[in-house]
A protein has these predicted regions:
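Active-site-adjacent C-terminal substructures of enzyme catalytic domains
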Residues: 202-263, 280
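Mid-to-C-terminal alpha-helical segments outside catalytic/metal-binding sites
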Residues: 262-297
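Conserved, mostly hydrophobic/aromatic
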Residues: 12, 31, 113, 184, ...
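An N-terminally biased module of ancient metal coordination in phosphate/nucleic-acid-related enzymes
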Residues: 1-97, 128-131, 189-193, 198-203, ...
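Non-catalytic positions within long, well-ordered alpha-helices that form the structural scaffold/packing
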Residues: 32, 173-175, 245, 275
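Extended substrate/RNA-proximal surfaces in nucleic-acid metabolism proteins
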Residues: 61-215
Length: 297
């Protein structure tokens, strides 16, 4: 890498409107203090009641106007604190069977949409209200990243989770939804050091994921969140990241911060990691929904 310093960006942050602990204002102050140039506010988009009945993990539909108003107030604050800081309105949008109409409605007005997979199996969508439907009782279904509820891991095993996840992730890539970035692409690695490491070879699944991202024109996020989980690698891990590089899949960076203190965490080192993996550019979003390709060094 050259001595030129690329702009510091963070495309993945959360607030207390979803499952974070900080406010928009606190995140903005943290980003400004760290010299961030672009920060995407990407709370978890509203979910059907069958998946998040108490709105513990996502922005409640009734709170969407207040969410946008709080964002706009934070954007005004950013302009005062650090005029070079661009605050971008976005959401992290879970993909699940039948989500398209919900995402289009609830994410209207978002400049950036992060696509992600946290849920496997039927979502139990019963209609416009998101009331549970009968398909919830059949096939295995549930969250894969909830340490308080590991029933799906216990039922399918680590290898089964990985196979189902890769297939679901590819379906998310193939969705007609305009996902700008696929967030934390190998999320099942979250529990790999807690007794849930796969026993099979992940290389064929990684090959499929890289080919799918390439063929559907998706970007991927290099996320520093895995480092804070004690995994010892990024999302995606080195083997999958190298496949994305070879496939020509563009990359961007995110912390997945759920606390203000984690905004921009590890992004500078993540840029160096991307360079070592073979990337020479990264993509940076703007508030108008456009993206700019920037040299890594």
């Amino acid at each position: 890498m050259s001595d030129r310093t690329p702009p510091l960006i963070d495309c993945h942050t959360h607030t207390g409107f979803s499952d974070g602990t900080s406010t928009f204002e606190e995140n903005v102050r943290a980003a400004a203090a760290r010299g961030c140039r672009v920060m995407v506010a990407s709370d978890h988009l509203t979910l059907p009641a069958s998946m998040d009945p108490l709105c513990e993990a996502s922005v409640a539909e009734a709170d969407l106007p207040a969410h946008r108003a709080a964002f706009e107030a934070a954007r005004a604050l950013a302009a005062e604190l650090q005029p070079a800081l661009e605050l971008v309105y976005g959401f992290e949008c879970d993909w699940y069977e039948g989500c398209e109409g919900y995402v289009e409605r609830w994410a209207a007005g978002a400049a950036v949409r992060l696509g992600s997979v946290h849920w496997l199996g039927p979502a139990g969508i019963g209609g416009a209200t998101g009331a549970p439907a009968g398909d919830m009782a059949g096939a295995p279904h549930g969250w894969i990243d909830d340490s308080g509820d590991m029933h799906l891991w216990e039922e399918l095993g680590a290898d089964g989770i990985w196979r189902r996840y890769a297939a679901t992730w590819c379906r998310a890539c193939e969705s007609p939804l305009a996902f700008d970035v696929m967030a934390h692409p190998d999320l099942p690695a979250r529990f790999s050091r807690e007794g849930w490491a796969p026993t099979g070879d992940l290389a064929p699944l990684w090959d499929e994921m890289a080919a799918c991202a390439r063929d559907t024109g998706r970007r991927i996020e290099l996320s520093t969140a895995a480092l804070r989980k004690g995994i010892g690698d990024y999302y995606p891990s080195a083997g999958l990241l190298e496949r994305f590089v070879r496939a020509g899949v563009p990359v961007t960076f995110g912390s997945d911060a759920h606390r203000a203190q984690d905004v921009c965490h590890g992004i500078e080192e993540a840029r160096r990691h991307a360079w070592r993996a073979g990337y020479r550019t990264f993509d940076m979003p703007h508030a108008d929904g456009s993206w700019e390709t920037v040299a890594l060094g």
